[in-house]
């Protein structure tokens, strides 16, 4: 295989593509599908491609016009499978008797009717059916590899029936599958972010294998796989990356200096700052987000939470203003202008030190100038910046700068980070996929 031909669905800012680039895979982008105009601008700027490659809404695109590709990536919309989104998933509601029911891939292709009265049923949330658009394209083009990504809640959505429908659909269109729950915190970013990844390999390229589910595992993923084994899902064993070491803390991805606009005013943070003054942040080993308190903001508890830079970031969301960005307690440094900093004492008329934040002394040819820097037990509370949120998704600073230069606003930059997939997780997946399966096809 000379170049890996890639088709990207629900592309966002192109995390799959960034991962392929970062590990040096020579690939050709056949096309991408994105409907958010700001995400499209960022995607094209980051990956240096024309908007003409965008097929737009995949549910309306003419799939027979899309050329053949080897790899299909699909981070299909997740809100309908999350707890916050209500988990409507693949549910339809009858327009006549109001009966609610899940649908199958065959129902989706033929047109959905109520199983009780046979009237027309409509999706409770159309985003929950977009997996089927991925399946339609995969069934028509028969790529060698399909990679899906979604929230942890997908596993138990509809009491496990949604995962069953997805797995059976992948089997029925010709793919053996494996799936795993991966947390970004184990992939060199300080973000607690669990996502389910499903890999489908065309059944003529891989032998059927019963899943090896560790006896000691009793998490939601292993329970889900055991349920699928009971209905004889066609599967194989992918060598998933290890998840055993948290290597970064939040403080390691923070900018050295951020604009004052990211800091919350003292009225909203006064109580917490006073508490932190008597109980400073600890520097013990932390493998989880470490909440240090709340600030005085209106709204849901989650937007009031403040975290220590010594721990991890909570899972990024689309944020969308209203103080929804993650917040940290930042220890302040005192910076004071000083004359002749190399001397411990100086007899002179006038002041030798300025107060913290005051302008420096006027430069002349006689005195030497410097700054005295010292930490003192005072904290300020601020939001993470858009760049810091992109770093939490393992995008390069250069990627961020390209999106910023394309005129993308801060609110959209936050949203794009929250909607994306952690690039370093995808890098680990691709390294195994390329080494074991793609290169094998080239031989």
UniProtKB/Swiss-Prot annotation:
GO molecular function list: DNA (cytosine-5-)-methyltransferase activity; DNA binding
Domain SAM-dependent MTase C5-type stretches: 4-440
EC class of the enzyme, as a word: transferase
Keywords, alphabetical: DNA-binding, Host-virus interaction, Inhibition of host innate immune response by virus, Methyltransferase, Restriction-modification system evasion by virus, S-adenosyl-L-methionine, Transferase, Viral immunoevasion
Role this protein plays: Modification confers resistance against restriction enzymes that recognize these sequences.
Transmembrane feature ranges: none
Catalytic activity, as annotated: a 2'-deoxycytidine in DNA + S-adenosyl-L-methionine = a 5-methyl-2'-deoxycytidine in DNA + S-adenosyl-L-homocysteine + H(+)
Family recorded in the similarity comment: Belongs to the class I-like SAM-binding methyltransferase superfamily. C5-methyltransferase family.
PROSITE patterns, A to Z: C5_MTASE_1, C5_MTASE_2, SAM_MT_C5
Gene responsible for this protein: mtbP
Active site: 78
GO biological process per UniProt: methylation; symbiont-mediated evasion of host restriction-modification system; symbiont-mediated suppression of host innate immune response
InterPro entries registered for this protein in UniProt: C5-MTase, C5_DNA_meth_AS, C5_MeTfrase, C5_meth_CS, SAM-dependent_MTases_sf
A family per Pfam: DNA_methylase
Annotated EC: 2.1.1.37
NCBIfam families in UniProt: dcm
Organism annotation: Bacillus phage phi3T
Domain of life: Viruses
Name of this protein: Orphan methyltransferase M.Phi3TI
């Amino acid at each position: 295989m000379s170049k890996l031909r890639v088709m990207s669905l629900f592309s966002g800012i192109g995390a799959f593509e960034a991962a392929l680039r970062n590990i040096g895979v020579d690939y050709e982008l056949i096309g991408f599908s994105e409907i958010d105009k700001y995400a499209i601008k960022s995607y094209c700027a980051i990956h240096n491609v024309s908007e003409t490659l965008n097929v737009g809404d995949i549910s309306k695109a003419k799939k027979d016009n899309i050329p053949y590709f080897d790899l299909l990536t699909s981070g299909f919309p997740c809100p309908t499978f999350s707890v916050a989104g209500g988990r409507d998933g693949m549910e339809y509601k009858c327009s006549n008797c109001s009966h609610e029911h899940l649908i199958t891939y065959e129902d989706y292709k033929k047109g959905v009717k109520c199983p009780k009265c046979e009237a027309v049923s409509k999706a409770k949330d159309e985003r929950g059916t977009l997996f089927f658009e991925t399946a339609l394209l995969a069934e028509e083009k028969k790529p060698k590899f399909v990679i899906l990504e979604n929230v942890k809640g997908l596993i138990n959505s509809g009491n496990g029936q949604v995962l069953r429908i997805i797995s059976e659909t992948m089997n029925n269109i010709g793919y053996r599958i494996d799936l795993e729950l991966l947390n970004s915190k184990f992939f060199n970013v300080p973000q607690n972010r669990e996502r389910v990844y499903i890999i489908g390999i065309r059944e003529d390229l891989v032998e059927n294998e019963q899943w090896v589910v560790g006896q000691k595992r009793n998490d939601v993923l292993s329970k889900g796989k055991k349920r699928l084994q009971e209905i004889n899902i066609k599967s194989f064993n992918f060598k998933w990356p290890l998840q055993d070491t948290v290597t970064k803390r939040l403080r390691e991805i923070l900018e050295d200096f951020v604009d004052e606009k990211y800091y919350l005013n003292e009225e909203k943070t006064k109580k917490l700052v006073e508490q932190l003054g008597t109980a400073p942040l600890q520097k013990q080993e932390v493998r989880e987000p470490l909440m240090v308190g709340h600030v005085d903001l209106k709204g849901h508890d989650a937007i009031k939470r403040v975290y220590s830079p010594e721990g991890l970031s909570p899972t990024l969301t689309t944020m969308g203003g209203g103080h929804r960005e993650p917040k940290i307690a930042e220890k302040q440094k005192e910076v004071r202008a000083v004359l002749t900093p190399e001397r411990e004492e100086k007899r002179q008329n006038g002041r030798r030190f300025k107060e913290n934040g005051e302008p420096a002394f006027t430069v002349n040819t006689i005195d030497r100038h410097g700054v005295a820097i010292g930490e003192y037990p005072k904290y300020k509370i601020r939001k993470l910046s858009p760049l810091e949120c992109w770093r939490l998704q393992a995008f390069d600073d250069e990627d961020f700068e390209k999106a910023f230069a394309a005129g993308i606003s801060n609110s959209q930059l936050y949203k794009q980070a929250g909607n994306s997939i952690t690039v370093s997780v995808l890098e680990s997946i691709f390294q195994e996929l390329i080494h074991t399966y793609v290169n094998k096809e080239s031989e």
